[in-house]
Amino acid sequence: MEKNPQALVDGFNRKVDYLRMSVTDRCDFRCVYCMAEDMQFLPRQQILSLEELYQVAERFVALGTRKIRLTGGEPLVRQGIVELCGRIAALPGLRELCLTSNGSQLGRLAQPLFDAGVSRLNISLDSLDPERFRALTRTGDLKQVIAGIDAARAAGFRRTKLNAVVLKGRNDDEIVDLVRFAIDRELDISFIEEMPLGVISEHERGESFCSSDDVRNRLAEHFTLVESAESSQGPARYWRLAEAPSTRVGFISPHSHNFCATCNRVRLTVEGRLLLCLGNEHSVDLKQVLRQHPGDSARLEKAIRDAMQLKPYRHHFEVGGEVQILRFMNMTGG
């Protein structure tokens, strides 16, 4: 491993070299596990400007961050997103600029994003049934999303991966079909355990929870799964399919197999809070530093370094019971 004297290290000697940045809390979908249907979004003055987002990215890269992922909300509804991607991708030392999307805007933006320097895309796809897709997203058009997926494939990204949040009784019967869809397009796919963020109304999380082990066991009835040591620097554990070597299946398991011991990431919310853990409220207000001391990169760097010592060893997600994290996923950075 290369040594960087500037590298960020937390209090448990974990190297932090991956930043997830939310560029907006807004989204053109209202997914049932992500936000309330009548979600009230932040006023413009409360969110970081594109320049402020860039300043944070620049300091993190100077401190050894090698991977940045832009998230939302839906990042592609933020005006100026392609230009922001171009500026961040050009930062010396950054190895990968990635982006997570619901796919709705990729038909028009996939190629510009690739040209700007985005190397990897994650695209959410929870169902292949148009009516069910609409029910899960409340507003989404499956045909439009599939067109976006195909546009991403044509653009030439280093890697395009599908993400599916599995909910028992709502879409768990589509697990095999989703993998076959990924195989047909030579894409990777990850199945994600639902995360207990925010108060939701459409289902009980304890009843809808579907573990990664359950998903994997069902897939093993149809495919030959071969465990892989490959990593994307994120939380997913990957398996190869003997029948389809071009497709990997990943499992993101915050409940059943938490990945806290090797956590290498922090999150920036669009309102400038640096979250040290997805499942805790530990945070540092970087917006205050940016606005009270504009252009002071040394002060911003110190705030980032000091924040690392607040990073807890692990989260304490619970499947059932009272919700402990009240912020919704779109406010966190999905």
Swiss-Prot record:
Instruction: Extract the InterPro entries matched here.
Output: Aldolase_TIM, Elp3/MiaA/NifB-like_rSAM, MoaA, MoaA_NifB_PqqE_Fe-S-bd_CS, MoaA_twitch, MoCo_biosynth_MoaA/MoaC, rSAM
What is this enzyme's class at the first EC digit?
A: lyase
- What is the protein's given name? GTP 3',8-cyclase
Q: Please tell me where [4Fe-4S] cluster 2 binds in this chain.
A: C260, C263, C277
Where do the annotations place [4Fe-4S] cluster 1 binding?
A: C27, C31, C34
Q: What Gene3D superfamilies would the database entry show? A: Aldolase class I
Query: What is the recorded function of this protein according to its Swiss-Prot or TrEMBL entry?
Result: Catalyzes the cyclization of GTP to (8S)-3',8-cyclo-7,8-dihydroguanosine 5'-triphosphate.
Free-text comment on the cofactor: Binds 2 [4Fe-4S] clusters. Binds 1 [4Fe-4S] cluster coordinated with 3 cysteines and an exchangeable S-adenosyl-L-methionine and 1 [4Fe-4S] cluster coordinated with 3 cysteines and the GTP-derived substrate.
Record's keyword terms, sorted: 4Fe-4S, GTP-binding, Iron, Iron-sulfur, Lyase, Metal-binding, Molybdenum cofactor biosynthesis, Nucleotide-binding, S-adenosyl-L-methionine
Q: Name one GO biological process term.
A: Mo-molybdopterin cofactor biosynthetic process
Give the binding site residues for GTP.
R20, R69, T100, K161, R265, V266, R267
Cofactor needs = [4Fe-4S] cluster
Q: Does the keyword GTP-binding apply?
A: yes
Q: Which SMART domains match?
A: Elp3
MF terms (GO), sorted A to Z: 4 iron, 4 sulfur cluster binding; cyclic pyranopterin monophosphate synthase activity; GTP 3',8'-cyclase activity; GTP binding; metal ion binding; S-adenosyl-L-methionine binding
Q: Please name the gene that encodes this protein.
A: moaA
Task: Please describe the quaternary structure of this protein.
Answer: Monomer and homodimer.
Keyword flag tRNA processing? no
Can you tell me which residues bind S-adenosyl-L-methionine?
Answer: Y33, G73, S124, M195
Residues annotated as domain Radical SAM core: 11-235
* TM spans (from-to): none
